[in-house]
Curated annotation (Swiss-Prot):
This is Endoglucanase 3. It is an enzyme of class 3 (hydrolase). Monomer. Belongs to the glycosyl hydrolase 5 (cellulase A) family. It is a lipid-anchor. A lipid is attached at residue 24 (N-palmitoyl cysteine). It comes from Fibrobacter succinogenes (strain ATCC 19169 / S85). Exhibits both endoglucanase and cellobiosidase activities. May be a lipoprotein and may be glycosylated. Residues 87-277 form the CBM11 domain. One of its GO terms (biological process) is cellulose catabolic process. Residues 42-83 are annotated as: Disordered.
Length: 658
């Protein structure tokens, strides 16, 4: 990370805090200033931290135009007026002095991704000392901090970024702060409230969408979440060391935009809006699920094969499927396979982005190369090793073509050369194993096509899938292929599908329902702030206040709705009702169906609830004779910790040491 204009910490914030506490002792006499806008600001509606992805900051849009015309990022904001913060808190900066020094006595600094290989830059004109400085505005004040920027990934592995912030002197007196407010206009961004306790850059943050009119951002510290890649640390306002803003881009495109920030104010806890009752505690609504044995019976011999080889499986997660996941070393290896086998698991699914090993992939897609070439030494070092180890420990093996970079998407899905690249990749892998005598080796075409967006249609995905099936069958007619539908291996889409004519295909679904339970606390989801949702739904553990479960003003409406309706979805029977649709389709078409992803994050739920959920899933699969593979081995969905099966999973999943 490249830092500019980084000055020593100063303790003015601590002094200002003490003065505020001394002068204003009655914490109940001050209302939240955001609820008392100045005259003329009636249409300036406060927004709270949004859990939307801050991926691409939009190109700058003229707010007066109905078209998406790009305008000069330095265009003077004309809306106003905005409110001036007053109360028991502390003004961080209103920028009215027009210089680089904040009201808390420290200077504004900037940073970017250049030291990590990125090419992002801040393009705002600097002063003579090369410091970022406020720009003129017409929003009821004279100045706001103006940052123009270009987000360019360059050679950086992840999303490009630029940022700017101000240091804060950690102080015990700062513990009375409960939130932050500021006004902004411009691109999507994150606000980072950095504390000294975090040592791995997994900072506490909130996300806000782009706005082409002035909006007030309201951040309650109780709603902050961490990025999710580092150690979880409780937020403590006494340890605040910096307040910064970050514009984050997209790996796939160049973004030019701007952001104006004004009137940054640390709120006293008494000024922070409190949660209010907004739900009812209802009795659970349990669906009645009925079916006959005939409705779920599959006589196809592949059903027996699936139950024999693909039941009680586990995914190796967060490794070779990553965008930067090309093999470097065996982060997971033979000892891990042995641990799984010793604990009663029968199948290993290896997510791996196969096309990362095509050495001329881009040239082939561009049409300049007509033959796809591979780094076979690396690719088959990995695959052959796991073929050997799984055979040694009597586990089946699934090669799962799995793309976290979302390179198969609505654009590439229409590119014949891209489809040919995927087909040739599978042909290459299948040819390598064509003579393998193992009948428990499986080829999974592509995990959750268009994984990030889910916008590729079933028909479009069928075209690509058929091309891969045909390519595999030119070299290998023996090994079974696994196919899942578009939209994240959708049950709904599969239930509408006509099976392929190839009679050696097993069909796959994924399910993480109820999502409000399984993904609570997931930093990459719209449920990032959600916590303590129980499974199953229990009125005795419910509340009339959705805020007790982490719902806040930024929580998306569909998430709020899902939580309010959880009394209808938080049961084993509700899950069964959905999975049964896939099983009935499978029985009707006499083809097997499996589940090779399900699981629950261990971030914000109790161990008891997770065991209840896993027990329900295993019982459903046993009842419907559906083989299952859990996501995943380690990490936040783990079944193994410190080399041992997590307590209670032996009974929940019907596994365990022999």
């Amino acid at each position: 990370m490249q830092l500019k204009n980084f000055y020593p910490k100063m303790s003015v914030l601590g002094i200002a805090t003490v003065m505020a506490l001394t002068a204003c002792g009655d914490e109940n006499t001050q209302a939240l200033f955001a609820n008392n806008p100045v005259p003329g600001a009636e249409n300036q509606v406060p927004v709270s931290s949004s859990d939307m992805s801050p991926t691409s900051s939009d190109a700058v849009i003229d707010p007066t135009s109905s078209s998406a015309a790009v305008v000069d990022p330095s265009t003077l904001p004309a809306e106003g007026p905005i409110t001036m913060p007053e109360g028991l808190g502390t003004l961080v900066d209103d920028f009215e002095d027009g210089d680089n020094l904040s009201k808390i006595g420290d200077y504004w600094y900037t940073y970017n991704d250049n030291d990590n290989g990125g090419a992002s830059i801040i393009t705002t004109p600097l002063n003579e000392e090369e410091n970022i400085i406020p720009g003129r505005v017409n929003n009821g004040s004279n100045y706001a901090l103006q940052v123009n920027y270009t987000l360019d990934r360059g050679d950086y592995e992840y999303d490009p970024y630029v940022g700017w912030g101000v240091q804060v002197a950690p102080d015990e007196a700062n513990g009375h702060f409960g939130g932050l407010t500021y006004w902004y206009k411009g691109g999507a961004h994150e606000v980072h409230i950095e504390i000294t306790d975090v040592e791995d850059y997994d900072v506490h943050l909130a996300k806000f969408p782009a706005s082409r009119t002035w909006k007030q951002a309201v951040v309650r510290f109780k709603d902050l979440v961490q990025g999710g890649w580092g150690k979880e640390i409780p937020f403590d306002a006494k340890h605040i060391m910096a307040i910064s803003f970050q514009a984050k881009g997209n790996k796939s495109k160049l973004v030019t935009d701007s952001l104006f920030i004004d009137n940054i104010y640390l709120q006293d806890s008494s000024e922070v809006e409190k949660d209010q009752p907004d739900m009812e505690i209802k009795d659970p609504v349990i669906p009645v699920v009925e079916f006959t044995e005939a409705e779920i019976t599959v006589t196809n011999p592949l059903q027996e094969k699936a139950m024999k080889y693909l039941n009680k499986g586990v995914n190796f997660t967060n490794w070779l499927e990553n965008a930067d996941g090309k093999f470097k070393s065996f982060e997971l290896g033979e000892s891990d396979v042995k641990i799984l086998a010793d604990n009663g698991f029968k199948s290993l699914r290896l997510p791996i982005d196969l096309d990362l090993y095509a050495t001329n992939r881009d040239a082939f897609i561009a049409g300049t190369d007509t033959e796809l070439k591979f780094d076979d030494d690396t690719l088959f070092l990995v695959l052959d090793s796991f073929v050997e180890w799984t055979a040694k420990y009597n586990m089946s093996f699934v090669i799962d073509y799995h793309e976290y970079d979302n390179s198969y998407n609505t654009t590439s899905a229409k590119d014949p050369n891209y489809i040919k690249m995927m087909a040739e990749t599978w042909k290459h892998v299948a040819a390598h194993y064509a003579e393998s005598p193992r009948e428990d080796l499986f080829f999974e075409l592509l995990n959750e096509p268009d994984m990030s967006d889910g916008k590729v249609t079933a028909a479009t995905w069928t075209t690509a899938a058929q091309a891969m099936i045909d390519a595999i069958r030119t070299v290998d007619t023996k090994h079974t292929i696994l196919f899942g539908d578009a939209q994240w291996y959708s049950i709904t889409l599969l239930a509408k599908r006509t099976p392929f004519t190839d009679d050696n295909i097993i069909y796959v679904i994924h399910t993480y329902e109820p999502f409000a339970f399984t993904h609570q606390g997931g930093s990459w989801t719209d449920y990032a702030t959600i916590h303590d949702i129980p499974f199953p739904y229990d009125p005795a553990k419910w509340s009339t206040v959705s805020g007790d479960f982490g719902v806040n003003k930024s929580t998306k409406s569909y998430v709020k709705t899902n939580i309010k309706n959880y009394y209808k979805t938080g049961s084993k029977e509700a899950i069964l009702e959905q999975i049964l649709k896939a099983k009935k389709w499978a029985a009707t078409n006499n083809v097997p169906v499996i589940i090779n992803e399900f699981g629950a994050l261990n971030l914000r739920s109790t161990a008891e609830s997770r065991l209840n959920y896993l027990t329900a899933m295993r019982e459903i699969c046993d009842t419907l004779q559906i083989p299952w593979t859990h996501w995943g081995y380690t990490g936040n969905f783990s079944v193994i910790e410190n080399g041992k099966l997590i307590e209670g999973l032996d009974k929940a999943l019907g596994v365990g040491s022999k």
